[in-house]
Amino acid sequence: MDEADWNFTEQQAETVFTCEQLRDTQGVKPHSEIVLDLFFLPIEGEEARREAFEKALSSFGYELGEAEKDEEVAASIGPIPFTPQDIWLHEERTTKMALARGFRPDGWGFAEPDN
């Protein structure tokens, strides 16, 4: 799978929807400072180049984290403002890195902001 096969428009719409839901139902304030956690899984049937993916993430300032599943890659960045635009910037960038190395996004999250 490469960028041409991925639906970035749908992914961005889901990010905007999720941010709106978190704002409206959980009271997360726009522009709250968050540390964004991003999760990735290998693409079935493709060679997942984990070391290359982790190196790419690190070179862009993402901290590698503990993943819940052995095959999963977890990365964090922040603090960043809680806005759909800021989250999407990182989600799109890391998705492109992932797809080029045999991984796909598997969601994002963050710890509840202090304010």
Where are the model-predicted features located?
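Long, contiguous binding/interaction regions
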Residues: 1-115
